[in-house]
Amino acid sequence: MIVPVQLSTLPVTPWKNGAGETREIVCVPSPDAPFLWRASIATLQNDGPFSCFPGVDRVITLLAGQPLRLKGEAIDHALTLWQPWAFAGEWPLRSEGIREPGLDFNIMTQRNRAAAEVRVVDDIQTPGDEGVAWVLQGRWQLGERQCEAQSGIFWHQQTPGELAPLTTDALLLVTTIVRR
């Protein structure tokens, strides 16, 4: 299954902790957990705590807005534009330094069942059987579909084929899911 997505058409739902909102791109089910893996885009409006997800690995990438800090016990990470950062879902983190609304891209995987690799690329990619491609800038040929910023595709149990830049300024956020 290969599905095109656009930010403007994704439904908005509250965060697990009620402190913000998210737009789910895809949620692949698991027989014994709420999901096997999940991709979403969250709105960053205020400093505050992250939702706790025990047994889940997360990767966050700032898509828009000013850099901010993610803080917790012995953790002080600067989250900057288009730089993926992986962390354990049970870490008690909070965001600090949000001065204007922003967006972040989130990938969550059940730690014992799947793993995610998230990269920003500017060249041709040939992804595996599960993942998400999100256009950061420029235009891309994502399999059979052309996409621009704030859009992309996800795929599950089927490769989309080649992901290729169509403009010289093209940047793509590519997530590859590997089942364990």
Where are these regions (language model features)?
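Jelly-roll (double-stranded beta-helix
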Residues: M1-R180
